[in-house]
Every structure is written in C-alpha cells, then in structure tokens.
Amino acid sequence: LKIARGINGTADQMIYMVADPDAKTRPVIDFQGLCTGMTIGGDYWYFKGFDVTGSADGQKGLQVSGNHNTLDQIETYHNGNTGLQISRLNVTDTYAEWPSYNLILNCTSYGNADKGYEDADGFAAKLTVGDGNVFDGCIAHHNADDGWDLFAKSATGPIGVITIRNCVSFGNGTLSNGVHYANGDMNGFKLGGSGVGTPHVVLNCLSFNNGATGFT
C-alpha cells in the first residue's frame, strides 16, 4: 500500500484518511505476512484511528517518507520489522528530500519482530531523516529491538533533530508472550550511533523494564 510522492495536500487543505469515529471496531490493514507494509510518500496527509499489522519478515509496517504529515492514534503491531519508521523514500534522495516536519501523535507500536529478533523497533527515525519530526504521546513496548531508534551512520551523515515528548518505552527485548530475545539492542530510547551526533530533544519521557539501557 503506497501513497506515491506527489500525491499531496496543502497546509490549508490536508488529505484525510480517518477511521469512522462511530465504528464499533478499529479498521485493520493486515498484510498477512505476504508483502511490504504501508508507505507514505505524499505531503500534508492526516491519518487517524486505524491499525497496521502483518508486514512480511524484514519489512516495515508503516514508513513515513513525505513531509508535514500527521499520524494520530495509529497502532502498528506484529510486523516483520519496525512498526513505524520515518526514513527516505528512494536511495537517491538527498538531505533536502528526506522526510521532514511529520507529527506522530498518540500512536502505539508493539510486538514487532523480524525472524532474527534483532532489527524490529517500535518506532524509528533513523539514517535518512530530515528536520522537524516529532513524536508526542506515543508508546512502544515489547518489540524485538529498541523502543525508539534514532541511529545515524557516517555513510549518510547526521540526521535532523528529532523531538520525542510525553512518550513511554518499556519491555523491549521481550515479546508480549514473555520470551526474551538477546539478539537486538533492546534499548528504550536509542538516540544515535556510529559516533554521528545530533542534539535530539527528549522531554517528559519514561523508559523502564527494557532489556538494555533506558536512554542511550
């Protein structure tokens, strides 16, 4: 499921993909382990109130690659890699084209695991992320790798400043069935890597019962 680059709203007229507020159950986009998940390449979209699950092994559940998008009350779980990740759309994209100014609001990501139990985070904004991205009021728990992963490396250079506020990360490195896996990094909030520094902002966040470090 891909929203291609160029299918855009505007600041004054966003495009909405929103669940029926009167529905008795939440809509579920289930890829049943067969394919890649959902990719957002457009700008100025507003998503609210649905679940994304079942991406194939090694495939992210939901990838945000556009700009100025809002994801509100989205749940990503039991995907074959990271539940929700902000990263570039194409390998040829330059920093100016990396996803910027996206708001991830009141979202939850849990139970995401690749077969090697070493790469699937709850949330990630890593490697190829632009400026002004924000996570607010989100929860990551019981993912195989980290709760949040903001990894950067020298080959692609520093990423933009990420703001994480009012968020909770717990139980990562142990899946919800209680089985502990030691292959992943298992941090609550991983805020960099490879000696490539970015002054990310973390405000009013809580991390507990993760397999490794709460904040690193």
Task: Tell me what each language-model feature is.
Residues 5-7, 42, 66, 90, ...:
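Small-residue (G/S/T/A) turn/hinge positions that recur once per unit in extracellular repeat modules
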Residues 8-11, 21, 97, 156-157, ...:
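Extracellular/periplasmic catalytic domains that process cell-envelope and extracellular macromolecules
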Residues 4, 18-20, 41, 48, ...:
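Feature marks extracellular polysaccharide-active and adherence modules
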Residues 90-98, 177-180:
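Intrinsically disordered, low-complexity Ser/Thr- and acidic-rich flexible linkers and loops
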Residues 73, 166, 180, 193-216:
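Extracellular beta-rich repeat passengers
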Residues 2, 31-40, 55-64, 80-86, ...:
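Short glycine/acidic-rich loop motifs that flank beta-strands on beta-rich extracellular proteins
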Residues 5-60, 113:
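Right-handed parallel beta-helix/beta-spiral solenoid domain characteristic of secreted/periplasmic
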